[in-house]
C-alpha cells in the first residue's frame, strides 16, 4: 500500500511542473514595471550632508524648492538658480568701467560706479556737477540737462570745455616757484577719518613753526600779505585778492589805529624795515561780533570775522606776489572743503604765548567735520565758521597768524577758502583752529570789489 501512495505523489508532482514554469517567466509589460528605477526619498541625514546640492541638482534635475533646501539661504539659492536654469549671463563681463554684474534668468543687471550709466555702464556721466565736479577744472553749474564749466578770473576755458588755461604770467592761485619734492606739510603722518593724525615719528623736526609749520620759501606763498603797525610791527596776516584788495579778519582791524601792508616778503625783519604800502579804505563786515560784544549780548564771538583792505596804489604782481583765486560758493562748499587738507601761513607765534616767528611759516591742516568741531569748542561755532587742524598733534595757527590765508588746492590752483580767525589757545589737545568760512561771504566780497571808489584819506567803513 505504501508503494502505491508514493507513486501517486510522484505523478501528481510531475503533472504540476508546466504551470510552475510558466509562472517564473513574466510578460514584458509586467516585467518592466518591476525593473523601472524608482527615485528614492532623501533621508533626513542626507538632507543635511555637505555636497547635497550635487546629488540634488547635478546628478539629477532638481526644483528651486529642492535647491533652497540644500542652500538654506534665499540669496545663495537665487544666485545658483539664475545660473542653473540658463547659464551665467555675466561670464562675458558685459558691464563696462568696473560695473558689477548680477546674473538673472535670461538677463543680467549692471550696477554702475558713480559717474557712469546705461545697461552696460557704457555711458560716462559728466552731466552732474556733483560727480567729479562735472570734470570741470574750476567752476561747474547746471544748464538745463547739461553742465557748463567756467574758470576763475584770469583763466581761459580750454577747447575741451573743461580745462582752465592761465591767461597771463601771474594768474591767481599759481605757485610760480614750486617746492622741489617738498610738501607744505610736516614730518610723515597717517590721517584717520576723524582728522586725528597718528605720528610715525616721536621726534619732530626742531626747526618747525606756525605752531610746527615749515618755512615758506620765496614765491611759495605769493598771496600772503602782512599787516604792519608802525609801533608793533607785523601783527596780522592777509590774502591778496586783486591789485587793490587784500582780505583779512575783522578783529585785526580793531587791534591798531594805523595799518600798512607788505607783500612778497618772507623775512619779518625785512618787512618791518622795508617799504610799506598805504591803505586807502577798510571795509569791516557790519555784523562782526568782537569778544566784548559777544559777552555782553550773548552772541557768538568772532562771528562775521571778515574785512577787506583797499590799497591806495595797485599791488605790483611778480613771481613772488600773486593773488589767491576767489571761488564760487558752490565750488567752495561742494569741492574745495571736501578735500582732505587746506593750507595756512603766517608770521604768528611759534607756540602759545611764545615769540613770533622771524620768517613766514606754512602748514597743512586737515578739515574737521562739523560735529567734531562744535563738540570740541567751548564757544559757539556758527555757520560762518569751520574748524581745521589736528586733534592731538601740536600743529596749529596761533596769535599773529590771524587774518591770514586758508587756501585749498584743486587741480594745481590755490583757492581762498578761509581766514585765520580764532581758537582756544594754540595747538591744544582736542582743540582746533577756527576759521571764517569764505563761501558764506562771496557776494559780500564781490560787491566791495566791484566798487570804483576814488582815492581818499584813509578811512574805515562797515558794510
Swiss-Prot record:
GO terms for biological process: blood coagulation; induction of blood coagulation in another organism; proteolysis; venom-mediated blood coagulation. The modification 4-carboxyglutamate is found at residues 46-47, 54, 56, 59-60, 65-66, 69, 72, 75. Gamma-carboxyglutamate residues are formed by vitamin K dependent carboxylation. These residues are essential for the binding of calcium. The activation peptide is cleaved by factor IXa (in the intrinsic pathway), or by factor VIIa (in the extrinsic pathway). Disulfide bonds join 57-62, 90-101, 95-110, 112-121, 129-140, 136-149, 151-164, 172-325, 216-221, 236-252, 373-387, 398-426. Residues 41-86 form the Gla domain. GO terms for molecular function: calcium ion binding; serine-type endopeptidase activity. Plasma; synthesized in the liver. Also detected in the venom. It is an enzyme of class 3 (hydrolase). It catalyses: Selective cleavage of Arg-|-Thr and then Arg-|-Ile bonds in prothrombin to form thrombin. The keyword Signal applies. It is found in: Secreted. The keyword Hydrolase applies. Heterodimer of a light chain and a heavy chain; disulfide-linked. This is Coagulation factor X isoform 2. The gene is F10.
